[in-house]
Amino acid sequence: KGVFYKKCCYFLKHTINTKLARLNYNVKILIPYLINFSNQNQIAISGKPFVIYNSIDENKEISNISVCLPIKKRIFTSSGSDIICSELIGYTSVKTILNGDYSHRKTAWKKAKDFINKNRETEERAIPLLEVYNKSANDGLSPSKWQTTF
């Protein structure tokens, strides 16, 4: 899809270490967990859930991820809570859309990197890698209807 500007936002996050093979399973569990937390605490949701890749070790096949839910206002959680509020600062990025299940995730990431290289865009390592779940299993849809933005 090309270059776009990601607006800043506040979000709830739960951070875990996961094997890459279990990433989808963990995300599928944690998104409803965050939604339930926001509903129980009357926190207004302001967008679709997303994942931030804090680190990826492809050799060990593990990743540290934050499963996130955008919210309208900044909140403060109790000390020791497994859910915290953070802020995503706005930035310019390359946008790639994957239609279908996540088995094609690597191909989508490769297309984004190819776009960066082809168009001589600068890859800024300080900007987090995001996956936004526009339409997913949590919406009760079949895999062919899923849409993920990278």
What are these regions (language model features)?
Residues 1-150:
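A solvent-exposed interaction/effector surface
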